[in-house]
């Protein structure tokens, strides 16, 4: 049916002239349109606008500040800032040293790598990073994931050299991934790890990490490589005859001390440094206790000798031809995504507290470069851990200089103090890890998810259960799969609703949300709440026809004026593809067969452009049947309804003429 059936009746033309006309946007050249689309997709923050109308020298200075953020804050750095950063840097170093050693053991790597990884990467981040509060270092979850994935292919005890080389290679590929995402502005990929996914994943990983520390608490020498809770508990309770009470007492004592200091610092925020110093204090006290009591002779395992000196170069250790390379690549990609998501989220959180912005893409480049450089200097995967960054924030850091101070403190430790860690008991490291992990189990966030969004809670618990009862990889895959499934569900099943008039106004709203709103006799107003694409076109066609069926049945039963007009409110339809246009043609044909008229309200520019190019507007629908607002569309339709009276719908009249 053409537009001739949709011509305005005589007498209504004057009314139409009083209404605003829906205009299609001016056509743009293809290259200009493509450039705009790419810019909006990859550069929503328009980072290069500051370079406009600047001379060459000024552009060079701005470019230097943009690509090397250290030049943004270094020129105005002063002694007052340094005093704050010095205190913060020394404070986080006291936490970084014991945590670094602990997390390296968690990854089945030599403990010294934890110190190496707290020396070089913070220096790189201080130059490239945009966060003032992020403190760089290793993290428990990435360490656990590295150990779990690499151990499936190589035994760290039987072939420690190959295992170490794979860890460096995985770190390299993690850095390449992170830097690439930042350079090509693809950081939105990380957004597929939703808040609910991260809460569940981190909670599950923290639970698994804590349970695995029972090996150190009970002084066990043989333990499962699996991370699921059943395997871990079986390994613990099948070796009760190997439990060492000396180790258990020592571990429980230090765990109680660490948790007590943490609780005290939470209650008294001014004394945050008490909890920050507690891990190093535990290492010192534990080492002294073992040294004077010779506890290592009674089943208390110690770290042993740590190599003295700065990071050795490891570029030649990277593996690019071994059959194990695929394992390194897989480990690097997965751990890189996890570390990236955590680091960016932590940086944004503290930036929000201090009311400044960080550039997510710059952060990705910074993380990537520090891991690439780290892989050449005997470091394994690093990011911005929450615990260390929180201490840095509470210590009053002003700039990334606190990372440089921390790195210098770690350098001093590597050069002169590593022999002092010989007698550090492993059980103290286990207690430090458990204490840190308990803070990652955010049960309050899970409760909040349950109250606000049950589906998000399901995603959270799926990630948690997947990690705890399966593996870290399974939990991550399950959570991401459910998140993507939910996204696809939102896209393929958009909301549609009937709109009614708010009494004594020209406002039209969803009748379910506003029960006081009233439908207009003879007119059905439908709202489409999403772009129309191939994924939802079929659903929308069926749902719109169903709305029409239900309205005609309701009108027939009530004896009201028969349905004459279908107004589609397209305010929320930002775009439409060819499948969506085909759906509109089909809807138009269905409406024609029922002797109804289709009216469009507030179609967006992109939609009007495509409907015009496809000749839907013109061949199927006249321009006069498009209105700028629902109110204008209803006014025009009501005028024609009252001018050309319609008979009430008969109860015996068939209403479904499809």
From Swiss-Prot:
Topology term for the membrane: Multi-pass membrane protein
GO MF entries: secondary active sulfate transmembrane transporter activity; sulfate transmembrane transporter activity; symporter activity
Transmembrane stretches, start-end: 86-106, 109-129, 134-154, 164-184, 186-206, 246-266, 272-292, 333-353, 364-384, 399-419, 426-446, 465-485
Gene Ontology cellular component annotations, sorted alphabetically: chloroplast; membrane
Induction, per UniProt: By nitrogen starvation, but not by sulfate starvation.
Keywords recorded for this protein, A-Z: Membrane, Stress response, Sulfate transport, Symport, Transmembrane, Transmembrane helix, Transport
Residue intervals annotated with topology Cytoplasmic: 1-85, 130-133, 185, 267-271, 354-363, 420-425, 486-658
Domain STAS: 513-637
Alphabetical list of InterPro entries matching this protein: S04_transporter_CS (IPR018045), SLC26A/SulP_dom (IPR011547), SLC26A/SulP_fam (IPR001902), STAS_dom (IPR002645), STAS_dom_sf (IPR036513)
Location in or out of the cell: Membrane
SUPFAM superfamilies: SpoIIaa-like
Distribution of this protein across tissues and organs: Expressed only in leaves.
PROSITE patterns: SLC26A (PS01130), STAS (PS50801)
PANTHER family assigned: SULFATE TRANSPORTER
NCBIfam families: sulP
Recorded family membership: Belongs to the SLC26A/SulP transporter (TC 2.A.53) family.
Name of this chain's protein: Sulfate transporter 3.1
Organism: Arabidopsis thaliana (Mouse-ear cress)
Lineage of producing organism: Eukaryota, Viridiplantae, Streptophyta, Embryophyta, Tracheophyta
């Amino acid at each position: 049916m053409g537009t001739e059936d949709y011509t305005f009746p005589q007498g209504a033309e004057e009314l139409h002239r009083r209404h605003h006309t829906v205009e299609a946007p001016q056509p743009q050249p293809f290259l200009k349109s493509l450039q705009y689309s790419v810019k909006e997709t990859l550069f929503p923050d328009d980072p290069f606008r500051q370079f406009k109308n600047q001379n060459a020298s000024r552009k060079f200075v701005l470019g230097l500040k943009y690509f090397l953020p250290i030049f943004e804050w270094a020129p105005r750095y002063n002694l007052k800032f340094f005093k704050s950063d010095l205190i913060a840097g020394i404070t986080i170093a006291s936490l970084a040293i014991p945590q670094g050693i602990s997390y390296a053991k968690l990854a089945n790597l030599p403990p010294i790598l934890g110190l190496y990884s707290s020396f070089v990467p913070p220096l790189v981040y201080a130059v490239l990073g945009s966060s003032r509060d992020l403190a760089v270092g290793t993290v428990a979850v990435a360490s656990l994931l590295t150990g779990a994935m690499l151990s499936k292919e190589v035994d760290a005890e039987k072939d420690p050299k190959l295992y170490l080389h794979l860890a460096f290679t995985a770190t390299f590929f993690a850095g390449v991934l992170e830097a690439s995402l930042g350079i090509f502005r693809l950081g939105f990929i990380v957004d597929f790890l939703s808040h609910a996914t991260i809460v569940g994943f981190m909670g599950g990983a923290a639970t698994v990490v804590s349970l695995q520390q029972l090996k150190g608490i009970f002084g066990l020498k043989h333990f499962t490589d699996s991370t699921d809770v059943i395997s871990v508990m079986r390994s613990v309770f099948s070796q009760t005859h190997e439990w060492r009470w000396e180790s258990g007492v020592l571990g429980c004592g230090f765990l109680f001390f660490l948790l007590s200091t943490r609780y005290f610092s939470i209650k008294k925020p001014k004394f945050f440094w008490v909890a920050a110093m507690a891990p190093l204090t535990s290492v010192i006290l534990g080492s002294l206790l073992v040294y004077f009591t010779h506890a290592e002779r009674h089943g208390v395992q110690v770290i042993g000798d740590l190599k003295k000196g700065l990071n050795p170069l490891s570029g030649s250790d990277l593996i690019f031809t071994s059959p194990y390379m695929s394992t390194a690549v897989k480990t690097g990609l997965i751990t890189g995504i996890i570390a990236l998501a955590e680091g960016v989220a932590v940086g944004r959180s503290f930036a929000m507290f201090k009311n400044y912005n960080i550039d997510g893409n710059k952060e990705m480049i910074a993380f990537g470069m520090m891991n690439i450089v780290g892989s050449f200097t005997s470091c394994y995967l690093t990011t911005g851990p929450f615990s260390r960054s929180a201490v840095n924030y509470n210590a009053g850091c002003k700039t990334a200089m606190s990372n440089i101070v921390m790195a210098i403190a770690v350098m001093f430790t590597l050069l002169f103090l590593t022999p002092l860690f010989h007698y550090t008991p492993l059980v103290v490291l286990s207690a430090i890890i458990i204490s840190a992990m308990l803070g990652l189990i955010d049960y309050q966030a899970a409760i909040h998810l349950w109250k606000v969004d049950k589906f998000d809670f399901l995603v959270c618990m799926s990630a948690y259960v997947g990690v705890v009862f399966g593996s870290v990889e399974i939990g991550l895959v399950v959570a991401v799969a459910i998140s993507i499934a939910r996204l696809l569900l939102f896209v393929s099943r958009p909301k549609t609703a009937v709109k009614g008039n708010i009494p004594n106004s020209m406002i039209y709203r969803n009748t379910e949300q506003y029960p006081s709103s009233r439908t207009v006799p003879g007119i059905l107003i439908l709202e489409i709440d999403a772009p129309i694409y191939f994924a939802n076109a079929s659903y929308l066609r069926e749902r719109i026809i169903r709305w029409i069926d239900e309205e005609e049945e309701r009108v027939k039963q009530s004896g009201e004026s028969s349905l004459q007009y279908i107004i589609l409110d397209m305010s929320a339809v930002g775009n439409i593809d060819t499948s969506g246009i085909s759906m509109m043609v089909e809807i138009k044909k269905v409406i024609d067969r029922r002797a109804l008229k289709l009216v469009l309200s507030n179609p967006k520019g992109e939609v009007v452009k495509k409907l015009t190019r496809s000749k839907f507007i013109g061949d199927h629908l006249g321009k006069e049947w498009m209105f700028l607002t629902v109110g204008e569309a209803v006014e025009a339709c009501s005028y024609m309804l009252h001018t050309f009276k319609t008979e009430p719908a008969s109860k015996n009249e068939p209403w479904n003429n499809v």
